[in-house]
Amino acid sequence: MASQGTKRSYEQMETGGERQNATEIRASVGRMVGGIGRFYIQMCTELKLSDYEGRLIQNSITIERMVLSAFDERRNKYLEEHPSAGKDPKKTGGPIYRRRDGKWVRELILYDKEEIRRIWRQANNGEDATAGLTHMMIWHSNLNDATYQRTRALVRTGMDPRMCSLMQGSTLPRRSGAAGAAVKGVGTMVMELIRMIKRGINDRNFWRGENGRRTRIAYERMCNILKGKFQTAAQRAMMDQVRESRNPGNAEIEDLIFLARSALILRGSVAHKSCLPACVYGLAVASGYDFEREGYSLVGIDPFRLLQNSQVFSLIRPNENPAHKSQLVWMACHSAAFEDLRVSSFIRGTRVAPRGQLSTRGVQIASNENMETMDSSTLELRSRYWAIRTRSGGNTNQQRASAGQISVQPTFSVQRNLPFERATIMAAFTGNTEGRTSDMRTEIIRMMESSRPEDVSFQGRGVFELSDEKATNPIVPSFDMSNEGSYFFGDNAEEYDN
């Protein structure tokens, strides 16, 4: 990792702040989530939601999506210039679920975007509070990561579906800023770059003219973000090659896919943040909690503590398992879709099952689903322990390279081995080491071959009791070393389609 001195912490990225000390960071992150909470309470009042309805995660998601859409400048402008039938560019809305005579009913609501913006600004001391908007985008992104497998998107860009552990943040919108870039996985960045290069190959004018100049700047910026995620000199050098290419084409795509594969073992630094649904912050604010005064952190005990004391409900379809639905949302709340299930299970205190064993579909309910048979249940979002979220790839003892597993990008800073099938991964690296990047490729392959699955990552790091807020007594769990736990193995999760 680059020394902390040159980087802003995630919270600073998230709150758009310059370098601040720990107390100031906690206060500004607190201000951000407090603003989300105040906005949520106001929206519940506007919509006349009962306490129970306000705690329904589906209602929370609709309200979050409305404010995100109200502030989506680019799309708003596009909608005004390309009026489509039946879409009012000045309005936003979605399904709100209400309890009527012992049944859940869906009501489609519509609001002026201007009105939503006014309520949002009012809840955020008159400011646009972009950080709070980004925070909600990351929560939606984490929910998508836990719910869907991006096999189709991977295959479309020529990558291997087994690389799904590199796809964190793949559904984040472009406008998610530095905080969004920090949580994107290596595969996500590679996919964005490949899409861009493919457009350049198919469209002669993509890199030309005034627009092309802007495109080029965006391309180089994305390359630099990806380069910053890699932790070995050879991987970074290859990124320089890709960035400096005069006319990016198939050679660059090859290099990027090679780099993505290498990240299965030589993992990149990807930030993890616990972003909770707006209703959770709303509940806390309503109960009189002052986030700004108390301070808040996305990577410490605070989100765990908040979830210990929040009761959130979810609609449940007839053949879904409420415990499985809870696991899905728990994983989303802690951005743990690509964490080792052994670690997640230990922290949560109940077994966390792979996606393929869950009897649950996504959290959102489609407009054509029958509400007659819908039930609701409490989401169990509490945990047994808490642990610090990591932004490193968990590479072992400074050897800049380490064991990975097809399918883990650690979320929690907790000691474990990262088992992987070296044969499976290395099989993808046969052949092609010629060309301009040959020495770098050789070096990367050498590092991968020398990594051992039994090496321990996050040496000495443990989990903490929920009463231990200063993290004084780490409890280092012992895991069955042979039994790796990856969420998307043997899987039949639905695809994410925009």
Swiss-Prot record:
Q: Where is this motif: Bipartite nuclear localization signal?
A: 198-216
Q: Carries keyword Ligase? A: no
Pfam families noted in UniProt? Flu_NP
GO cellular component labels: helical viral capsid; host cell; host cell nucleus; ribonucleoprotein complex; viral nucleocapsid
**Keywords of the record:** Capsid protein, Helical capsid protein, Host nucleus, Host-virus interaction, Ribonucleoprotein, RNA-binding, Viral nucleoprotein, Viral penetration into host nucleus, Virion, Virus entry into host cell
State the post-translational modifications. Answer: Late in virus-infected cells, may be cleaved from a 56-kDa protein to a 53-kDa protein by a cellular caspase. This cleavage might be a marker for the onset of apoptosis in infected cells or have a specific function in virus host interaction.
Q: Give any single GO term for biological process.
A: viral penetration into host nucleus
Segments carrying the region annotation (Disordered) are 1-21
Q: Does the keyword Ribonucleoprotein apply?
A: yes
Chief place where the protein resides: virion
InterPro entries reported for this sequence:
Flu_NP
Q: Which GO terms describe its molecular function?
A: RNA binding; structural molecule activity
Q: In which residues does the motif Unconventional nuclear localization signal occur?
A: 1-18
**Where is the protein situated, by its record's location annotation?**
Virion; Host nucleus
Q: Which domain of life is it from?
A: Viruses
Give the HAMAP family listed for this entry.
INFV_NCAP (MF_04070)
Q: Briefly state the protein's biological role.
A: Encapsidates the negative strand viral RNA, protecting it from nucleases. The encapsidated genomic RNA is termed the ribonucleoprotein (RNP) and serves as template for transcription and replication. The RNP needs to be localized in the host nucleus to start an infectious cycle, but is too large to diffuse through the nuclear pore complex. NP comprises at least 2 nuclear localization signals that are responsible for the active RNP import into the nucleus through cellular importin alpha/beta pathway.
Its subunit composition reads:
Homomultimerizes to form the nucleocapsid. May bind host exportin-1/XPO1. Binds to viral genomic RNA. Protein-RNA contacts are mediated by a combination of electrostatic interactions between positively charged residues and the phosphate backbone and planar interactions between aromatic side chains and bases.
The UniProt family comment states:
Belongs to the influenza viruses nucleoprotein family.
Protein known as: Nucleoprotein
- Native species: Influenza A virus (strain A/Goose/Guangdong/1/1996 H5N1 genotype Gs/Gd)
Q: What is the lineage of its organism?
A: Viruses, Riboviria, Orthornavirae, Negarnaviricota, Polyploviricotina
Q: Which gene encodes it?
A: NP
